[in-house]
């Protein structure tokens, strides 16, 4: 297990605040009850008064405090959750209808809607209040130097992998400086903590998220040609790569030809309840022994690091959360993202004249390419499959590859390596056209293609990263991979999937007035559900993917936009 990380961002004082907020969270559950209870709300509360808040909490009745007593306590000692992120003035690079915006979107309803989605960037743009840096002991929010674009709703702070699709949308909106601000905020986190945090909160310092920082930098460079920006962020890309190459993330697997391959896994530095969901984690772990609880909490945090929290993908038994085994899984998508990172770093190093570094990372990407195809590729299914390590607790220096250890359940992640075809750093295509077509056929037969997009899995477990939910990032990764595969038929399928996704987003927006975090891909126009919190709106990555699809494919005058 990875070592437990101390809460960063304010040292002992930050730990003390978080401890207080978790006690408030627990007391609030007793006072308000479980219906519509969101534990994250309470660890996001800024402390408005001094440390007497702890004594006042202790003085509440030993029996469950009443609703009124709890409301009065919170009102007396805390500011509103999210009040330490202040609405920013309109970003200076925002224009209501920027020149060159979506020139191939011809249908009036489609264009009007796209402009409304574009305008949402104003609503989601924030600045961290100066009080956060002045009094870090009163905030779980971390200070950041630039403007931030938040996902929306309960997600009041910056999140790592969400930011990639926010950046993609901002580039379509010609908001290049705001896109750079987002990246520089993440670089600030790398410089301070050694990696990009899951999100900009002190309680997220124990884990990261799918690593897409280099992809953001590459897309911004391709849009702007800003070499100074590349030079500024390049050292942080190297630092982040080192984080993912650390011993706790690395796994060595020997194939049947005796070749040893190094791949990566998720591994949070935590073995306690997640502060933002502590009451939920404690309930799941209530019947476990102390040692089993620590293992469970570690797996829960590691699963949160995947971005897929939660899914049957990570469970030995999809009906039992305590069977999460994420740190014993070599994920297809994580290794895709790290290979892309290595390609990007090789490209940037060559660009800025560091030829030796470029060669090192080019070789690293080729080695990971071979590893992915040797360990994760399944020729019978024509898909890449997650690889499960033994879960008996016996760590091995090198694991012997076994066919039976590939997880043959079908997930959208099985097709994510196609996305490596879409990279623009001038290196060779990851999947040749013939293989891409075979993977496309496998996708068509998989059961994942639904009327409103690509389902996340085939298992309807009630978890949000399972059937029938579809998520914007997965649509985008697979569509871009198909699009750049070199096959005309794959391009047609890519456009068909994008069309389904645009239509369901449009109809849901017209029905609710909002963009949603996820969608039910069985029914066009229906938002998604499931998971440990209520469905959210806003929504950063959904907005970014819609703008990207409209930019890529346009929308002809004679093509209907609704379901």
From Swiss-Prot:
GO terms for cellular component: plasma membrane. One of its GO terms (biological process) is trehalose catabolic process. Substrate binds at residues 154, 161-162, 198, 207-209, 274-276, 307, 532. Its EC number is 3.2.1.28. It holds the Pfam family Trehalase. The keyword Glycoprotein does not apply. It catalyses: alpha,alpha-trehalose + H2O = alpha-D-glucose + beta-D-glucose. It comes from the Eukaryota. Keywords: Glycosidase, Hydrolase, Stress response. The active site is at residues 309, 517. InterPro entries: 6-hairpin_glycosidase_sf, 6hp_glycosidase-like_sf, Glyco_hydro_37, Glyco_hydro_37_CS. The keyword Hydrolase applies. SUPFAM superfamilies: Six-hairpin glycosidases. Signal peptide: none annotated. GO terms for molecular function: alpha,alpha-trehalase activity. Belongs to the glycosyl hydrolase 37 family. Involved in the regulation of trehalose content by hydrolyzing trehalose to glucose. This is Probable trehalase. It comes from Oryza sativa subsp. japonica.
């Amino acid at each position: 297990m990875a070592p437990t990380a101390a809460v960063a961002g304010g040292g002992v004082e930050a730990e003390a605040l978080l401890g207080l907020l978790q006690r408030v969270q627990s007391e609030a559950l007793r006072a308000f009850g479980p219906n519509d209870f969101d534990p994250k709300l309470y660890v996001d509360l800024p402390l408005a008064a001094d440390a007497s808040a702890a004594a006042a909490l202790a003085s509440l009745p030993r029996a469950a405090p009443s609703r009124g007593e709890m409301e009065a306590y919170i009102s007396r000692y805390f500011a509103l959750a999210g009040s330490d992120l202040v609405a920013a003035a309109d970003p200076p690079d925002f224009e209501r209808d920027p020149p060159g915006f979506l020139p191939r979107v011809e249908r009036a309803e489609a264009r009007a809607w796209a402009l409304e989605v574009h305008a949402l960037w104003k609503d989601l743009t924030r600045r961290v209040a100066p009080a956060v840096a002045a009094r870090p002991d009163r905030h779980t929010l971390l200070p950041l130097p630039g403007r931030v674009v938040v996902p929306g709703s309960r997600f009041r702070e910056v999140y790592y992998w969400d930011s990639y699709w926010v950046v993609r949308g901002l580039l379509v909106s010609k908001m290049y400086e705001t896109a750079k601000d987002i990246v520089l905020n993440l670089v600030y986190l790398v410089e301070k903590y050694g990696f990009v945090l899951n999100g900009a909160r002190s309680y997220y310092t124990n884990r990261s998220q799918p690593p897409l920082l280099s992809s953001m930098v590459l897309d911004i460079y391709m849009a702007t040609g800003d070499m100074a920006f590349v030079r500024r962020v390049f050292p942080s890309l190297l630092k982040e790569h080192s984080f993912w190459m650390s011993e706790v993330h690395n796994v060595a697997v020997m194939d049947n030809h005796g070749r040893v391959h190094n791949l990566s896994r998720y591994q949070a530095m935590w073995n306690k309840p997640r502060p933002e969901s502590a009451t939920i984690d404690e309930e799941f772990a209530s019947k476990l022994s102390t040692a089993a609880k620590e293992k469970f909490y570690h797996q829960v945090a590691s699963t949160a690091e995947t971005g897929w929290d939660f899914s049957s993908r990570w469970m030995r038994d999809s009906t039992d959360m305590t069977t999460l085994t994420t740190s014993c899984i070599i994920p297809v998508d994580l290794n895709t993202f790290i290979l892309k990172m290595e390609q990007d770093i090789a490209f940037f190093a060559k660009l800025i004249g560091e030829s030796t570094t470029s060669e090192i990372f080019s070789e690293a990407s080729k080695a990971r390419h071979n590893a992915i195809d040797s360990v994760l590729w399944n020729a019978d299914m024509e898909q890449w499959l997650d690889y499960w390590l033994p879960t008996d607790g016996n760590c091995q220096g090198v694991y012997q590859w076994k066919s039976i250890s590939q997880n043959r359940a079908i997930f959208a992640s099985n097709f994510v390596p196609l996305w490596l075809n879409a990279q623009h750093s001038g290196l060779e295509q990851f999947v040749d056209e013939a293989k891409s077509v075979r993977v496309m056929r496998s996708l068509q037969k998989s059961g994942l293609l639904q009327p409103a997009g690509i389902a996340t899995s085939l298992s309807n477990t009630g978890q949000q990263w399972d059937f029938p939910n579809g998520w914007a990032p997965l649509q985008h990764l697979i569509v871009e991979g198909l699009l750049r595969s070199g096959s005309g038929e794959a391009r047609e399928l890519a456009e068909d999937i994008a069309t389904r996704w645009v239509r369901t987003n449009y109809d849901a927006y017209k029905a609710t007035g909002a963009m949603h975090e996820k969608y039910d891909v069985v029914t066009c126009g229906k938002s998604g559900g499931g998971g440990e919190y209520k469905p959210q709106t806003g929504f950063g990555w959904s907005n970014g993917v819609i703008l990207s699809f409209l930019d890529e494919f346009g929308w002809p005058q004679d093509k209907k936009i609704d379901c």
